[in-house]
Amino acid sequence: MSYALLRPFLFNMDPEHAHEMTLSLLDKAHKARVLGLVYGQSMQPTDCMGLQFSNPVGLAAGLDKNGDYIDALAELGFGFIEVGTVTPKPQVGNDRPRLFRLKQADAIINRMGFNNEGVDYLIENVKRCKYKGNIGINIGKNAATPVEQAADDYVYCLERVYPHASYITVNISSPNTKNLRDLQSGEALTHLLDAIKNRHSQLATEYGFYVPLVLKVAPDLDPLQVDYISQQLLDFEIDGLIATNTTLSRVGVEDLPDGDQAGGLSGRPVSHISTQILQQFSDQLDGKVALIGVGGIDSGAKAVKKIEAGADMVQLYSGLIYKGPGLVQSCIQSIGGYYDAMEN
């Protein structure tokens, strides 16, 4: 069944239940060995952060929080998969309802709150999967951990996931964990990166191989914050930046049903602001840090906009919900066409 036929049925369901059902259906199709026949794999080889990717279009964190569906999702043609956000201990997240569709705007508001089964559960899934591509693991802190002790949670997760991840993303930008975004500023960011980078260097020595470190930031940053974060990335030799997470802004959706729900807004309305922030980081970092663009990509043209703004690679999430799995190949082909045109 095509996604266009399935979507009306899914969109009449509770969003979180529909999310779970979609992943279950994908898993069944994967086990029946039909997904690869339908979607295949487009090649657009990309080198980034010292890693080789089959193509520059990845899955953003949040869709497969626990790594339960890596093999099924990989068959949609992604060049890399990011799982998580995962925390040291399992946690249920915020109360339901916590996921809302804004259909008129092709948008989603979520206040999930890092619901996950804990880092050890995720690691077992990563170890068990057959996918041979790059897997990023996105780490966060437990809601019960005071923000002043956040570094302890991040370092704990870093230690656990290090031998199993292709790269590790430090998520300090979710709006749904109290005070988490405070870690994006001032001494809090410096202290966090110092603790993470010190342990990261030790782990690289202990294991004898290097796993790139990535920071994921919010779109709700002013120019001074962009400048400060950029300098911290350079000072601590962080390998990559994901721009961006969801926004607290409600511009363009404030009058829509559920447009005033608390949480982070993703999808089409965040496209412009996230691309602006990406461009600002690109200007500041001047190619010294790898950039992954995410936010509002619902077409191949939008993916190219991220590349034009300085992204080395892109990630999808909300666009998949509204446009379906065919969006992956569309983005790969559009980015490939863009690079071909640049060379001619």
From Swiss-Prot:
What are the GO BP annotations of this UniProt entry?
A: 'de novo' pyrimidine nucleobase biosynthetic process; 'de novo' UMP biosynthetic process
| Top-level taxon of the source organism | Bacteria
Q: Which cofactor does it need?
A: FMN
Q: Which reaction does it catalyse?
A: (S)-dihydroorotate + a quinone = orotate + a quinol
Binding-site residues, substrate: K65, N110, R111, M112, G113, F114, N171, N176, N245, T246
The UniProt annotation places FMN binding at A61, G62, L63, D64, K65, T85, N138, N171, K216, T244, G267, G296, Y317, S318
Report the main location listed first in the record. Answer: membrane
Fetch the SUPFAM superfamilies from UniProt: FMN-linked oxidoreductases
CC annotations in GO: cytoplasm; plasma membrane
Gene name, Swiss-Prot/TrEMBL: pyrD
What PANTHER family does its record include?
A: DIHYDROOROTATE DEHYDROGENASE (QUINONE), MITOCHONDRIAL (PTHR48109:SF4), DIHYDROOROTATE DEHYDROGENASE (QUINONE), MITOCHONDRIAL-RELATED (PTHR48109)
Its record classes its membrane topology as:
Peripheral membrane protein
Origin species: Psychrobacter arcticus (strain DSM 17307 / VKM B-2377 / 273-4)
* Primary role: Catalyzes the conversion of dihydroorotate to orotate with quinone as electron acceptor.
Q: What is this protein called?
A: Dihydroorotate dehydrogenase (quinone)
For the protein in the UniProt heading, the enzyme class is: oxidoreductase
Q: Which UniProt keywords apply?
A: Cell membrane, Flavoprotein, FMN, Membrane, Oxidoreductase, Pyrimidine biosynthesis
Active-site residue numbers? S174
Location in or out of the cell: Cell membrane
Summarize the subunit comment: Monomer.
EC number(s) of the enzyme?
A: 1.3.5.2
Q: Which family does it belong to?
A: Belongs to the dihydroorotate dehydrogenase family. Type 2 subfamily.
